[in-house]
């Protein structure tokens, strides 16, 4: 099982990198660089929106963990989880396992595992809701295979989240799940705002429908590329495939995808530093310590 997972991860990463090289060559590296320079201040704003995502999800986690967990420990765990979520394959599940491992000294093992399950379920539901919103509002822009793919993505993520809520309900904390859902929806709203700011900087003619189209494609690409490191090549490919639907040229579409990744990587650096400050390293052996199985 571990070998198969390693092979799948390696293949996904290799395909993603190869695809990314092809995308940049197709769009023109000089043109992409020009667009990114024009977007530099928008990247700063997008980074702030990413910080709002961290704050929102930390607020939701606080509702589940309760006052027994020290605030500093919770913030460190959330930052470390954010970093793992965006750089490792199956990032969200690994992030929840990491947070559970880091916070297990403060709460019983069953409690932290239950919180991780609830967070994972609500994250899936929030992605499903956000994708459905993009699909419904921007359905005039999307058509054919792209619309079908986004509809399937919305149904799968929403269904998976609800199924996890039902099947693991007994292991989850009895209270706080509503606040977590609000926090996850707020996190996705901040992500959507970041995407729109970047889109407007790359293409000043873009409107709200174009923004929802790009956001929906980004969500879908991130899920499809869940096995790849940092979803390289997958979010970029999704935006490139939907560039015409969002009235973008190839360079602008790729620039938005790259700028989103830059904003995320800024917080990944903060998260890695926060995780390393606990034990001198991130608790990577979370599966041995907590026994998570939420992928």
Q: What is the role of each PLM region?
A:
Residues 82-85, 119-123, 260:
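Structural signature of transmembrane alpha-helices in multi-pass secondary transporters
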Residues 79-97:
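Short intracellular "coupling" helices and adjacent cytoplasmic loop segments at the cytosolic face
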Residues 68, 87-91, 101-107, 129:
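Generic hydrophobic/packing signal
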Residues 93-99, 234-239:
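Transmembrane helix boundary and interhelical loop/hinge segments in multi-pass membrane proteins
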Residues 62-63, 99-101:
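Hydrophobic transmembrane alpha-helix segments characteristic of membrane transport
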Residues 114, 231-232:
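Hydrophobic alpha-helical membrane segments of integral membrane proteins
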Residues 1-80, 108, 127-227, 234-237, ...:
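Predominantly cytoplasmic-facing regulatory/coupling regions of multi-pass membrane proteins
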